[in-house]
Amino acid sequence: MGTAALLILLAGVSWAQREVAIQPGPLYRAEGSQISIWCNVRGYQGPSEQNFLWSIYLPTAPEKEIQIVGTNDPSFSYAIYSQRVRSGGIYVERVSGDRALLHIRQLQDQDTGEYECHTPNTDPSYHGSYSAKVNLQVIPDTLTVSSPAQTIQKVEGGSLQVTCEVSQNSSRHTHLSVSWLRLSEGEATEIISVTQNFSVRPGPSYAQKHSVGDVRLDKVGDSTFRLTLYNLHPSDQGDIYCEGTEWIQDPDGTWFPLTQKRSEGTSVTVLPTDKEFNVRLETERRTYNGGDTATLRCIIEAQNPGDRLFAVSWAFNSSLIASQSPGGVPSLTGEYARREDGGELRVGKDSDSVFSLKIFRLRPEDSGKYNCRVTERERGPSGELIDRESKRPKNIPISVLPLRTSLTVTVTANSSSVLEGVRLSLSCSVASLAGPQSRVSASWHLQDKQGRQRDVVRQDRDGVTWAGEQYRERLGTGGLRLLRSGSDTFSLELEGSQRTDAGSYECRVAEWVPAPDGEWQLLGERSAQANVDILALETGFAVTAITRTPGVTYFDSFDLQCILKPHYPPWVGVSVTWRFQPAGGGDTHDLVTFSRSGGVQWGERAGSFRGRSIVEKGDSTHTVRLSVSRASDSEAGKYQCVAELWRRETSGMWARLAERASNLLEIRVQRPVPRLQVTKVTRTLSVVEGSPVTLSCSIRSQSGPDSRFAVLWLVQQPSGAEGKLIGRSDAGTEFGTYPEGALLKGRLQLGVTAPGQYALTLQGARTDDSGSYYCQVEEWAMDPNQAWYRLAEETSGLTEIRVRPPDANLQLDQLPRNVSALEGQSVTVTCHVLNRTLPDSRLSLEWLCWRAGHMERRGLARLTVDGVLGSVEEEPGDVAPGLPSRVQVSQPSLGLYALTLRGTEVRDSGTYSCLVQEWLRDPRGQWYRRTEERSGATYVSVRQPDPQLQLDPSLLNVSVMEGGHFDLDCMVSSRSRPDSQLAISWSLQGTSRGAEPETLLNVDRSGVWAPLAPRWEGRLQQLQLSPTLFRLHVPRVGPGDSGNYTCLVQEWLLGPRGDWYLLAQDEAVIGWIRVQRKESNLQSTICANDALFYLVFFYPFPIFGILIITILLVRFRHRPTGKPGEGKNGVPLLWIKEPHLNYSPTCLEPPVLSIHPGTID
């Protein structure tokens, strides 16, 4: 019974399962904060104190484990975390033997990842989970908490308001909580808070004040939290600050504070109530001018004036002016009430502690002593107001000076000298008026050159304007204007100034103020003067002619300017005429006239000037410009301008006032300076006979863009001799040759490759063409009158040409190559011509082949210079008969020749190359062989396919009853080619000692059976289930059929010439067959039936185990008290090893159940 109990206990323990649990995720924490992650294990065996290993998988490498910290190994941490572990920034706290906390202080962005808690195995076997993972995301700390630092003094019983800005910009869904606290003597007291669940919670010390409404917390806008305290008490003083916390809800539903910050504090002092008060009277100054404004302020110095009742009365020379109730409502007496109605006096309350008296438009009689009296009132029991205490400050004396003007007047003119007929403008500026109520009147007067006084115009204080007797007509026609800009500027404008308008102008300004009786009172008068002179039109009239280009070249332009002085306005009539005297002599004549009305009139002898000249007059510059373009000899000479000044009379007729002539201007017109430059480089050219030679004649610079050139080509034969003309291209771009170049005429080409680039090409150079060649360039230009003239001539440098026969330069690719191919495939061998002597040379090729065992190379194919392919006769006894017929020659590209062998055989292996001959044509047209070259060798290797035949080595081990049957499979796992054919042979190695293998069946590649042995006749059957799977069916087996069966497979391939050859073969033992004689017993019956076998030998054991566990549990519940882990007589229970079941591999023996005792540790 004790053994059964121990077995039941062992089975029960084996059912225990270890389970590791970790804090649910994902978790989100703010950067810079800390985190604690719990991990526990249960269902384990072994010591009660389990170890915990913490690792992380970073997002950048999710498959790579990085060890952080462990409880059992100080060196567990990787280098990236070892410093933080040593400094205590990361550590593990063991809560109990099977529970631990991972603490990380000062979280960093790189701490984001998947954390794994792992518990090393202490169980007898691995069963259950040993680790758990949780994701941690470190997010930025975006919480901001701010409140202005300030110092506030309050009176007991008053109120206080402070605000705090709390906001966050997190990407996760978070909540905010805000708390107001008071710090006094180092101890913080909570005033009121709004939690992360949006509920308002007062602190314990302020719960009573909150219940009666003396503590409020309001949210203003999106992020402003306002604290309001009413009925302040001295105990409320201290540093008041706010504290903001950002919360996030973890997956387990708990709220976790991500981060917490506090603001600057507001220092609050609450003073005890003081009922005393003082009064102070202030004013800006004590001396005023009549019409000014005086302000007096009565200031009350008291605690909490807004909560107290003060009444104020104002007095002048001890006489009451006005009184004000505590609410600020005024009550005025007598004359002062009327002045208030007229807007001359105002009594007001500026704030709780400041009362004011304002007197507008002071009068001299307002001089005297002013004072205010302040009376504090309190409400009696029945609500009536009772005067408690009255106070008044010292008197303030004020002096009001009589009215007098302080005007300043300034006169300015647009010019001290004005041209006759130009507008005359004068401005009279007024400054320092007595006040906003004052008005001014202005008048203009003139004293002419003869000393006579004239009244020009005036404007009274109401803005009415009238002119003097001599100026009324001009005022009516708009020739006279008096303009007022604002209140301080009077402008006088006279259109069409006359000589009588010259003189001294005076502006007189008078200032007026309203008198108390409603009339206007003159304060004073001020004046200023300015002198203006009117200049006659012809005064200073002068004409000057200038030019910046006295010397010009053909086709250039030149400008002549006629400058008029002084600058006359557009209404003054001025006519200008340009005169011209040719350089070759002759009379001076008028070219063009610019009339006073703006018209242009050309002279009778203007000639070519009309088509290439422009006359312009500038209104702003007072100049008349004559512009001449495309200058030629016809425009060379002397120029002069004559100007006439005209004035329109009152009758409307024009009268000529003056005429002025300018200085003479001489213009010289020259031909352009030759700038022709031809390249003078001397060089030597060595050319191959028959090749073309190109000589260039380069014009580096030319005199003008429209120049034309005649190019003459000359040759010196021999060098140094006189040059002979062989070709010419004239200015009309016509090409030709000359008698000196008659022999070259058929081979000479003249051309222009680009502007300024001339070329002479000599085709098919011969040795007698050697010599020194050069060009001579003539530059022709067209003058402005469309006539051509030769401008310049230049000769180029010599080019010595030496004609020689061509150098042999045939080059073939000499790089050796290896080509490998399977039998039957095609092989291509290339022959690459890298270079040749001349581009137009011709090539002949011969393909050669050398095989091992042969002394000489043999030709395969020939290609003549005409591109004709010649075949090579097959030689008797050739190792590779029919090879020429399988050869194909092609030219894929220029210079690349290819030899292709079709249907290759093993005996086609060898070394291949090509022999190339280059043929050139001499100048007479005959072809001759210049050189020959052999290419690099190409080593061709033709081989049969690699044998890859392989059989599946699976071995079948079966027992068959006599008279039964069995099947053997021969599986080909791989073959060399899919088009190969297979032959199969089956054989038997009997069980008797020394027996020879016996062939059962031979099937050739065509599926034909070989004759069978007599004992197998009619018994065998071969099936081909797939191209690579063959099955042999053997019925009616007998004892002699026992033994090892072997399968031999041969792989045959079709050769290039159509004959089959054996490529590979493989043999494998595919089965061990044991034939048993017929007998009937229980063992054979059970083994022959799978269901009966499991019923007898498998199912009883689980049922037996469940029964033992049930008995063991019942025993444990009713066991007597004793030492744990002991059975009867104190024998330990847990010492039985697992039962061992021994099975026969062939099912010939029944299973044996044995229980072996173990040892007690």
Swiss-Prot record:
Span of the annotated motif EWI motif: 246-248
Gene3D superfamilies attached to this UniProt entry: Immunoglobulins
Entry keywords, A to Z: Disulfide bond, Immunoglobulin domain, Membrane, Repeat, Signal, Transmembrane, Transmembrane helix
InterPro entries according to UniProt: Ig-like_dom, Ig-like_dom_sf, Ig-like_fold, Ig_sub, Ig_sub2, Ig_V-set, IgSF_V-set/TM_domain
Record PROSITE patterns: IG_LIKE
Transmembrane segments annotated in the record for this chain: 1092-1112
Membrane topology category: Single-pass type I membrane protein
Disulfide links within the chain: 39-117, 164-242, 298-372, 428-507, 562-641, 697-775, 831-914, 970-1047
Protein name as catalogued: Immunoglobulin superfamily member 3
Compartment list: Membrane
Keyword Cell membrane: no
One GO CC term, this protein: membrane
Topology, Cytoplasmic side: 1113-1161
Signal peptide stretch: 1-16
Domain Ig-like C2-type: from-to ranges: 18-135, 140-258, 272-382, 402-523, 541-651, 674-796, 806-930, 947-1063
Pfam families according to UniProt: V-set
UniProt-listed CDD domains: IgV (cd00099)
Extracellular domain ranges by topology: 17-1091
Presence of the UniProt keyword Glycoprotein in the record: no
Originating species: Xenopus tropicalis (Western clawed frog)
